[in-house]
């Protein structure tokens, strides 16, 4: 399971779904959701600092729903809007074993960090790469939910790490930025090689 990861000022025309799937994580809605294209390192768009969501509208909720479906489709446990070329402060996470308990954080803000922790992280935007990243063991987070209601969350263990990972994305930061320049270059070269191979297979 990858720690997946993961904008406003976006343009709807830049959201290019690869296919449509049935909305499955809520019995309340019966609409179709799009699986979005995930950007991969070293795409410069991943370095964009996301802007706050001014108001939670149906359009924002559609983005949230598409992000959740994309996260499940990619088998990640988290996704930031930056990763799908939407530059707003939106994050979705699901660390549950059942894979049907998505958490939505709009305009998330870490209020407090406590302790030290770290695991070997991966990322949907850096496929095939993993590295140990230092993180706070516990965090207190304030955010809005899918309906625009504010809440505060106390998180520890994997959830705390995932939140920090995804919020890094909103600042244009990737987990590879914690690595040495040499390791970062090796990962970039590996991804470029994979991309060239895939293009030849088309």
Curated annotation (Swiss-Prot):
Binding-site residues for Fe cation, renumbered to this chain: 123, 165, 169
GO biological-process terms attached to the record: co-translational protein modification; translation
E.C. designation(s): 3.5.1.88
Annotated catalytic residues: 166
CDD domains referenced in this protein's UniProt entry, alphabetically: Pep_deformylase
EC top class, as a word: hydrolase
Keyword field contains Membrane: no
Keyword Acyltransferase listed: no
Entry's cofactor comment: Binds 1 Fe(2+) ion.
Domain of life: Bacteria
Functional note: Removes the formyl group from the N-terminal Met of newly synthesized proteins. Requires at least a dipeptide for an efficient rate of reaction. N-terminal L-methionine is a prerequisite for activity but the enzyme has broad specificity at other positions.
PANTHER family (alphabetical): PEPTIDE DEFORMYLASE (PTHR10458:SF21)
Protein name: Peptide deformylase 2
């Amino acid at each position: 399971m990858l720690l997946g990861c993961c904008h406003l000022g976006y343009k709807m025309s830049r959201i290019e779904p690869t296919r449509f799937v049935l909305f499955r994580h809520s019995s309340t809605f019966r609409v179709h959701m799009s699986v979005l294209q995930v950007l991969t390192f070293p795409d410069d768009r991943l370095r964009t600092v996301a802007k706050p969501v001014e108001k939670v509208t149906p359009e924002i909720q559609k983005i949230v729903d598409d992000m959740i479906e994309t996260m499940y489709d990619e088998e990640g446990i988290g996704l930031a809007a930056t990763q799908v070329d939407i530059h707003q402060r939106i994050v979705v996470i699901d660390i549950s074993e059942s894979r049907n308990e998505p958490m939505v954080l709009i305009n998330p803000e870490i209020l407090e960090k406590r302790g030290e922790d770290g695991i070997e992280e991966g990322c949907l935007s850096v496929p095939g790469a993993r590295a140990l990243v230092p993180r706070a063991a516990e965090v207190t987070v304030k955010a809005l939910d899918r309906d625009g209601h504010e809440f505060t969350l106390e998180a520890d263990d994997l959830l705390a790490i995932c939140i920090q990972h995804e919020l890094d994305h909103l600042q244009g930061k990737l987990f590879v930025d914690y690595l040495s320049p040499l390791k970062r270059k090796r990962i970039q070269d590996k991804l470029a090689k994979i991309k060239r191979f895939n293009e030849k297979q088309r």
